[in-house]
Amino acid sequence: MTAPSQVLKIRRPDDWHLHLRDGDMLKTVVPYTSEIYGRAIVMPNLAPPVTTVEAAVAYRQRILDAVPAGHNFTPLMTCYLTDSLDPNELERGFNEGVFTAAKLYPANATTNSSHGVTSIDAIMPVLERMEKIGMPLLVHGEVTHADIDIFDREAHFIESVMEPLRQRLTALKVVFEHITTKDAADYVHDGNERLAATITPQHLMFNRNHMLVGGVRPHLYCLPILKRNIHQQALRELVASGFNRVFLGTDSAPHARHRKESSCGCAGCFNAPTALGSYATVFEEMNALQHFEAFCSVNGPQFYGLPVNDTFIELVREEQQVAESIALTDDTLVPFLAGETVRWSVKQ
């Protein structure tokens, strides 16, 4: 039996789902991504959201200004879909290379999504335009009806929104983001070449027991919420199979500690510092390291029609302890796996 590999050399990865926030928070978190990833799809759920070409250009510049010298990083901007969005603005941004994709948040599904879409019909002209110009739609796939249990919202979304939408707009490219259920894993696996998915490290590593048994762990609380272990296992099996329409999307979502550790805590895991090593650990546990590079660095560009990165990075298999916290101007940020010993990390 061969000893496990101590170094993994892979083509530089991309993060196809990332929150960078703004202001001081942005300046703090950007380097954790720009150090490792060549590109990242940046979420538009600021307050106010990014709904115009002008706003996206300005936000992109703020991100680039926060990238340390020596990092070669390209933020890929997205447009936040609203009921009142002008299709011409969206097309202009796409044609000018400002918008890479557009993001569909059902109204009030997650952080800063109150401006989101109230119904698919309300944005049908926009979606039809996206289908025509080949612009990908990124979907937070949960229904938000009060009568639907939070653990069932993704499965309901497939049936009531996603499938009717894809039947109606058969040429639309769709990324089902941060999938968390066996239902979604099966749906994407059985779909055609115009449907892909991202998966976060926390949904591969943990299930709802980890978050709730023996005490509530607020730093594992994110949306979509962690599900049962059968769903976690389905996600792990999907990535381990080498399926090529699933790719890395951390959904790294920083919140200051006092906003996570409170009587009404915010959803989101700040996993940018530890995500890549976490994914490597999962692939190793599943005896699937041969598919790790494709998941991180090839499948995403392939789906988006972009070139793969031409530089490489190395991960090293040696135990390291994750920092307990990261300083902010007037608070701290608790990273995913804070204080824990991890098996894989990016070689500095």
Curated annotation (Swiss-Prot):
It catalyses: (S)-dihydroorotate + H2O = N-carbamoyl-L-aspartate + H(+). GO terms for molecular function: dihydroorotase activity; zinc ion binding. Homodimer. Disulfide bonds: none annotated. The gene is pyrC. Zn(2+) 1 binds at residues 17, 19, 103, 251. Belongs to the metallo-dependent hydrolases superfamily. DHOase family. Class II DHOase subfamily. HAMAP family: PyrC_classII. The lineage of its organism: Bacteria, Pseudomonadati, Pseudomonadota, Gammaproteobacteria, Enterobacterales. Its EC number is 3.5.2.3. PROSITE patterns: DIHYDROOROTASE_1, DIHYDROOROTASE_2. This is Dihydroorotase. GO terms for biological process: 'de novo' pyrimidine nucleobase biosynthetic process; 'de novo' UMP biosynthetic process.
